[in-house]
Regions:
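Membrane-interfacial amphipathic/re-entrant helices at transmembrane-helix boundaries
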Residues: 1-22, 34, 48, 57-72
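Hydrophobic alpha-helical segments embedded in the membrane of multi-pass proteins
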Residues: 15-24, 40-44, 83-86, 192, ...
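Short, non-helical or kinked segments that cap or interrupt transmembrane helices
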Residues: 27-48, 93-106, 187, 232-245, ...
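Alpha-helical transmembrane segments within multi-pass membrane transporters and channels
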Residues: 61-111, 271
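Transmembrane helix-bundle core of multi-pass membrane transporters
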Residues: 110-180, 282-295, 315, 322-330
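Helix-loop-helix "hairpin" substructures at the membrane interface of multi-pass membrane proteins
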Residues: 156-234, 257, 262
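Cytosolic-side transmembrane-helix boundaries in multi-pass membrane proteins
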Residues: 193-207, 277-330
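Transmembrane alpha-helical segments in multi-pass inner-membrane proteins
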Residues: 230-301
Length: 330
């Protein structure tokens, strides 16, 4: 039962960054801009958020007000991710550069920048920014008495509970409402489907595309912090390819919030199963095969490729995504 509780709670924990980053990609691509740079946005958001947590830890504010400090770090992650996404927007919208190449360049820049910044602040050779233990939400956070011995519900709720999870729930609901229940969402989707028609009725396509890219940066930055917290080993100037996995989640989810949510849980579950492969009796052990655990660690990425092979043909991407908008081409 304890393993089941851990698997469920870890699945939620690892689904959160996938959900946030995939939703960010959804906003950008519905506006008409392909966002390959989600990985870089995650790295930049996580970098500055972890520096913020480290500063709060040293000042004593973090241990005294852990969730306020965590909320501030989440906002820093979102803000820095937004700033970083501006470079993609400028290249793709103003300069009309190839969006895939621009995103790839930002992805290459982000980890190198993170290493340099980490060395500059912590000292050369120190590439890991530790995550303080007080960021986790515990029973004590709610004034509840500690539990003696193992408890299914305690493991399920509190073992891997961070503020990023309720924040992700709020942002998911907000993303759905904004995308499908507001005039802004309608205009954003119009710019990704028929930008010339949108322009003809007075919608500023450039502004809406910038909005989509900046929103993706905000969500991507928070997703970077969520991944770093979930990984538990501190920030190491990368996010384990989660930005690219989030792209797969977005495509598998057909650029829609609820399918993206289901896809996030699906892929996160396979990642957790890989982590617990040695403890799960129903998984084949392949006696005599060396390092079988490495196979299970590859499983989430193998599943990703298989799923995309069978679902990509039915995916309906925004019609004008990746096509620079030229007002004079109407």
């Amino acid at each position: 039962m304890m393993i089941a509780a851990n698997i469920i709670s870890l699945t939620v924990l690892f689904a959160v960054p996938l959900l946030l980053v995939a939703l960010g990609g959804m906003f950008s691509e519905h506006s008409g801009v392909i966002n390959i740079a989600l990985e870089g946005m995650m790295i930049i958001g996580a970098l500055f958020a972890c520096f913020t947590l480290q500063a709060f830890d040293k000042s004593g504010f973090g241990p005294a007000h852990p969730q306020l400090a965590m909320l501030a770090a989440i906002l820093v992650a979102g803000l820095t991710g937004t700033i970083f996404s501006f470079f993609l927007g400028f290249a793709a919208i103003n300069l009309k550069a190839d969006q895939t190449i621009g995103g790839t360049a930002l992805n290459q820049f982000a980890p190198a920048f993170a290493v340099v910044m980490t060395w500059a602040i912590q000292g050369q050779g120190l590439t890991t920014i530790a995550i303080p233990s007080w960021v986790r939400i515990t029973r004590d956070t709610f004034g509840l008495a500690p539990v003696d011995g193992p408890s299914f519900w305690n493991n399920l709720i509190f073992k891997y509970f961070y503020l990023t999870t309720p924040v992700a729930v709020v942002l998911f609901i907000a993303a759905y409402i904004v995308m499908y229940k507001t005039r802004f969402g309608l205009r954003l989707r119009a710019c990704g489907e028929h930008p010339q028609a949108a322009d003809s009725v007075g919608i500023t396509v450039y502004t809406m595309r910038y909005a989509g890219v900046l929103i993706s940066g905000f969500l991507g930055g928070i997703g970077g912090l969520a991944y770093t917290v979930a990984a538990g080993s501190g920030f190491n100037s990368d996010v384990g390819g989660y930005g690219f996995l989030a792209l797969a989640v977005m495509i598998f989810g057909n650029w829609k919030p609820f399918p993206i949510l289901a896809s996030s849980v699906f892929f996160a579950l396979f990642k957790v199963i890989a982590a617990y492969s040695s403890s799960l009796s129903f998984l084949p052990k392949f006696e005599g095969v060396k390092e079988i655990s490495n196979f299970y660690q590859m499983l989430p990425y193998i599943v990703t490729m298989i799923v995309l092979i069978f679902t990509s043909k039915n995916s309906q991407a925004p019609k004008a995504e990746g096509i620079p908008y030229d007002k004079g081409s109407r």
